[in-house]
Amino acid sequence: TLTYGFAKEAAVGTSAPGGHGYPESSSGPGALPPGLWARDVVCHPRGSSFRIEDACSERSESIDFELKLPGKHNVSNALAAAATCRLMSVPLGKVAEALRDFQGIRRRLDLIGETGGVQVVDDFAHNPQKIRSTLEAVKLGSTRVLAVFQPHGFAPTRLMKEELIEAFSQTLSPNDILYMLEIFYAGGTVKRDISSVDLVADLVKRGLRAVYVPKRELLLESLREGARPGDTILVMGARDDTLTDFCHEILASLQNTTLQTSQ
């Protein structure tokens, strides 16, 4: 096995987002334990840059990395890939070269398009940690986020309700707006005793601008009327392949609209 993570956290023996624990260093304060560690992390709207230090041997190696994917969670993913390659004796320089051209995968901060200064982004985020990471990444390049979330499944929504509320409460800014569609129902005899209305009600109590939207047609109208230059419309949800189609509908709708410059 090979330990990896962020140098700032490893040097003080703390944990990184996602729950990775790092051993205390035996070489004194600020020293790194054996592993791969990211330093000088800079996340920007179109990607990330950082340096990976290989502290697995006496002769440490340090390589600069650039990603075309924003967000600290993608830096963590790159570290995991580098650690895997390191175990297979692939040089870090080769890993950096490969990741520099990596465009990402479908429905992970997937930029559908931009019109009138408004971006439409599609993402698979569906649990609290992924929602938090995705929102943090999108906010790097946005003056405001218009987040659209479709919870997936009644049982998962029931189970994660409080954590979902916490994720949105801690990540959304006062000027951001959350539009919540009804829970995605894939059929079956599942107990349907919770609704997106319940989540929205609790979010509103916390002072968030959260809106329940029962139909996508109504949401298209709201986004047409409310979007302005500098906004990012972020559509999140899992298991429903039509969400990507809906992103394209949003983009087409905005292209036929004169966007407001203020609100």
Predicted regions, residues:
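Nucleotide/phosphate-binding loop and acidic/charged catalytic motifs
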Residues: 77
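Acidic-glycine-rich active-site phosphate/pyrophosphate-binding loop
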Residues: 13, 40-61
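Active-site regions of enzymes building and remodeling cell-envelope glycoconjugates
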Residues: 1-3
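A short glycine-threonine-serine/GTX helix/turn-capping micro-motif
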Residues: 63-72
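Conserved phosphate-binding catalytic cores of ATP/NTP-utilizing and phosphoryl-transfer enzymes
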Residues: 33-36, 74
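ATP-dependent carboxylate-amine ligase
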Residues: 10-13, 17-34, 46, 60, ...
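Short, acidic/turn-prone active-site loops that include or flank metal/cofactor-
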Residues: 5-9
